[in-house]
């Protein structure tokens, strides 16, 4: 109870303003009350993602919290959070992510001093790992990559990080293309796919070839190349059948489709794939992924992004979050290169979100300490 008595009624936070895409600082945000299966986390560090500007810009919800990835300390637990039901306990250092800019749960958002998080939608930070490193791993990227790679609705890859795919006798592991390998999602995808036993070919600028190779990519191609798709198809001996498109633009989709071998295959994009583009090659099965669906909640978004509650996917997500904890504790995955700001706090977060929006960040994960 001593920890509870130190928790204020209101807090500092960033929220959506009445102007779409503009974040507003407040000192009177109510500290959230807990549901029985939630924990209250005092936030220490947050990591930025493209969704931190895309959601407030494209899905304005004035007053809603913003920010997804976080790390911090559990300072209060809900009535159902107890040993035998949940692994987390009071005082644990944890990391994870929430669905921010959420009109159904406007209190959610990690750019704050305190957040309420479901006790099975996070992972415990191992001893010796700094908060800013844990925040940079978070759950946005690793969750979306896991969903895209291994769920039956998407690539449904054979093998897993725990049980790598076994090639046929005398053969080589299958290829997977990660389009956009020098992004935070890209370097995480490369690591997880390599753990699962695959060969990985990726795209980025030549300046980032060494970066993606340091995370395990077998071959990198310049995404500016006019014959990119044909070059990848030739390099993979016309056998590529799995593609993860982090960029998910009309151009990247066409290049990905051109890379897939004659027999066709599976494509998953990290943005909504319009039907008119998805169907340009009949031998390719296309899907797109939204990481927040792993929480199993209703997604109240328009423009084709919304979805009803999905308990099955929520159960899959909870299992993946636990697998993420195991990967972190085993030293199997590491974050994207970190640009850490220890001083600027909420002002720095606002500036960082604007940098992401202007496309000024490359090869770095922006992380801020909450001061």
Curated annotation (Swiss-Prot):
NADP in keyword set: yes
Entry-linked SMART domains: PKS_ER (SM00829)
UniProt-listed Enzyme Commission number(s): 1.-.-.-
The keyword NADP belongs to this UniProt entry's keyword annotation: yes
Any one GO molecular-function label of the UniProt entry: nucleotide binding
Catalytic activity: L-leucine + 8 malonyl-CoA + 4 S-adenosyl-L-methionine + ATP + 9 NADPH + 12 H(+) = (5S)-5-(2-methylpropyl)-3-[(2E,6R,8E,10E,12E)-6,8,10,12-tetramethyltetradeca-2,8,10,12-tetraenoyl]-2,5-dihydro-1H-pyrrol-2-one + AMP + 4 S-adenosyl-L-homocysteine + 8 CO2 + diphosphate + 9 NADP(+) + 8 CoA + 7 H2O
Signal peptide: none
A Pfam family of this chain: ADH_zinc_N
InterPro entries: ADH-like_C, ADH-like_N, GroES-like_sf, NAD(P)-bd_dom_sf, PKS_ER, Trans-enoyl_RdTase-like
Keywords: NADP, Nucleotide-binding, Oxidoreductase
Pathway(s) the chain acts in: Mycotoxin biosynthesis
SUPFAM superfamilies: GroES-like (SSF50129), NAD(P)-binding Rossmann-fold domains (SSF51735)
Oligomeric and partner information: Monomer.
Function per UniProt: Trans-enoyl reductase; part of the gene cluster that mediates the biosynthesis of myceliothermophins, mycotoxins that contain a trans-fused decalin ring system connected to a conjugated 3-pyrrolin-2-one moiety and that have potential anti-tumor properties. The polyketide synthase module (PKS) of the PKS-NRPS mycA is responsible for the synthesis of the octaketide backbone. The downstream nonribosomal peptide synthetase (NRPS) module then amidates the carboxyl end of the octaketide with a leucine.
Family classification: Belongs to the zinc-containing alcohol dehydrogenase family.
Protein name: Trans-enoyl reductase mycC
The gene coding this protein: mycC
């Amino acid at each position: 109870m001593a920890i509870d008595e130190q928790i204020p009624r209101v807090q500092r936070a960033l929220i959506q303003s009445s102007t779409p895409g503009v974040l507003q600082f407040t000192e009177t945000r109510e500290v959230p009350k807990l549901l029985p299966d939630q924990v209250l986390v005092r936030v220490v560090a947050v990591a930025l993602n493209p969704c931190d500007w895309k959601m407030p810009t494209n899905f304005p919800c004035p007053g809603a919290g913003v920010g997804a990835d976080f790390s911090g300390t559990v300072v209060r637990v809900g009535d159902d959070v107890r040993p035998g039901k949940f692994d987390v306990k009071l005082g644990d250092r944890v990391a994870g992510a929430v669905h921010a800019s959420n009109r159904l749960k406007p209190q959610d958002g990690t750019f704050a001093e305190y957040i309420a998080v479901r006790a099975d939608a996070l992972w415990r930070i191992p001893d010796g790992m700094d908060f800013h490193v844990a925040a940079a791993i978070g759950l946005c990227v690793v969750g979306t990559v896991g969903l895209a790679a291994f769920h039956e609705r998407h690539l449904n890859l054979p093998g897993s990080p725990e049980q790598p795919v076994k090639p046929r006798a005398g053969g080589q592991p299958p290829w997977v293309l990660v389009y956009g390998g020098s992004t935070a999602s890209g370097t995480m995808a490369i690591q997880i796919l390599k753990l699962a036993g695959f060969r990985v070919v990726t795209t980025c600028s030549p300046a980032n070839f060494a970066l993606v190779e340091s995370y395990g990519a077998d071959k990198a191609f310049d995404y500016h190349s006019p014959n990119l798709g044909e070059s990848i198809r030739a390099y993979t001996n016309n056998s590529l059948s799995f593609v993860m498109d982090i960029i998910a633009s009309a151009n990247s989709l066409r290049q990905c489709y051109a890379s897939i071998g004659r027999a066709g295959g599976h494509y998953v994009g990290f943005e909504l794939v319009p039907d008119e583009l998805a169907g340009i090659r009949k031998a390719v099965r296309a899907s797109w992924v939204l990481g927040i669906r792993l929480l199993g909640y209703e997604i109240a978004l328009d423009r084709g992004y919304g979805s009803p509650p999905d308990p099955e996917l929520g159960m899959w997500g909870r299992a993946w979050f636990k697998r993420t904890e195991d990967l972190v504790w085993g030293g199997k995955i590491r974050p994207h290169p970190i640009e850490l700001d220890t001083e600027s706090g909420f002002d720095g977060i606002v500036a960082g979100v604007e940098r992401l929006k202007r496309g000024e960040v490359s090869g770095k994960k922006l992380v801020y300490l909450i001061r």
